Curated annotation (Swiss-Prot):
Limits of the Fe2OG dioxygenase domain: 134-239
Keywords, sorted A to Z: Cytoplasm, Dioxygenase, Iron, Metal-binding, Nucleus, Oxidoreductase, Vitamin C
Gene: OGFOD1
Protein name: Prolyl 3-hydroxylase OGFOD1
Catalytic function, reaction form: [ribosomal protein uS12]-L-proline + 2-oxoglutarate + O2 = [ribosomal protein uS12]-(3S)-3-hydroxy-L-proline + succinate + CO2
GO molecular function: iron ion binding; L-ascorbic acid binding; peptidyl-proline 3-dioxygenase activity; peptidyl-proline dioxygenase activity
Record lineage: Eukaryota, Metazoa, Chordata, Craniata, Vertebrata
Residues that hold Fe cation according to the record: 155, 157, 218
Species for this entry: Pongo abelii
Superkingdom as given in the UniProt entry: Eukaryota
SMART domains: P4Hc
Biased composition range(s): Polar residues: 400-416
Amino acid sequence: MNGKRPAEPGPARVGKKRKKEVMAEFSDAVTEETLKKQVAEAWSRRTPFSHEVIVMDMDPFLHCVIPNFIQSQDFLEGLQKELMNLDFHEKYNDLYKFQQSDDLKKRREPHISALRKILFEDFRSWLSDISKIDLESTIDMSCAKYEFTDALLCHDDELEGRRIAFILYLVPPWDRSLGGTLDLYSIDEHFQPKQIVKSLIPSWNKLVFFEVSPVSFHQVSEVLSEEKSRLSISGWFHGPSLTRPPNHFEPPIPRSPHIPQDHEILYDWINPTYLDMDYQVQIQEEFEESSEILLKEFLKPEKFMKVCEALEHGDVEWSSRGPPNKRFYEKAEESKLPEILKECMKLFHSEALFLLLSNFTGLKLHFLAPSEEDEMNDKKEAEAADITEEGTSHSPPEPENNQTAISNNSQQSNEQTDPEPEENETKKESSVPTCQGELRRWKTGHYTLIHDHSKAEFALDLILYCGCEGWEPEYGGFTSYIAKGEDEELLTVNPESNSLALVYRDRETLKFVKHINHRSLEQKKTFPNRTGFWDFSFIYYE
């Protein structure tokens, strides 16, 4: 009898359970050959192109939108579920606040793996063909989740090797009122961002990609929804780096020496407590210990009230300060200020205040203030007297620097061994103390950023706050000090009405004002006419 002998019964074969393989297919925008040629031609000629499945625009820089990138809704829902199960980490600094997953480069979830495959194989090949850029196989993608008040401020994405950025949105029904738009900036004659000229609203399954260049300035606007999350996958395709245009350096802000003004101005303006010499000694001891201090109720109440009234109801001319990749706030036109505000500005420029600040801090901001050299000479004279009287001698102590700037320990030690300060000492001895300052208005959306050309030097920062009643730290608007190259904050100064903040910083310390978010509008519930706060911001140099 012909036939196969039945297999002997035995134990079932045990092996690893294989994960179900998932396939993803993308839009006709990528697979249709005629369309591909048209898109490639538009890219090459830098001309707009519009089709129902793909739109390319050149204004303000080359960007492209594919409204329905993945064909299968089931795939997208599976992908969303896997992403929501990832661990997210809060990302927080001067530039952004949102949650980000770990790198998706090696995740094994089926839908994430399938998306990674089509993006960095098939789609990368299509992008290389239409852009004529030799894109590398480098995988660079992660998942971001933006919730209420999260934002990513103005930047250009430029980093060695990044050539094309992409974002795939997986959001619930979304409109402009929810925030979270991808805002694109025009540029000025110096290739710096100028203003938002286009906003792309996230939508489910929309893919946006754009060419990364020295002018690809964009931001993710603050998310205003308290219920909905803005979920997206984003990353970059890498290739040969572009040549950057020469760096643009802003003209330095002029510094001026003190205005001759006698001490009467202090008695007119400042709380008498702070003019008591014994109290000034206490302040200096505390300041030398920590390099910062907050002096509450600094101005006399009647003067402070008049200043606040002029700020709230006076005819102050404000102008916006940018560019937005460095700062966004309003500055008062000093020459057109109401008289009381002019007088307040004069106070901070005055010779008497320079001397008072010297007494508060131990810094030599006035020729009458004792310097470290004076203190050393006094010590030497005392030692010489001891030698004469006792007929003995001993080694003089090492010079001491009583004033330590806000910094971390490792940086302080670098400062002490750096030969550069010696070179500057001669300049310092012959230089005249100077200052620069402005009156600023802070409202929702305002901020300052640390940037590549942020100048770090020894300086005393002074801030006097007005109109901060009811202001909470969660609104933003506080000033943060960080060590250069680090995200960890060394010091945070929160706005507090009629409080004078003094901070001495070194060349390894940078500062920024945190983005003011939409929670700040809650201030209006208590103060209907308020839309933020003001500060007098000055910097003093020895």
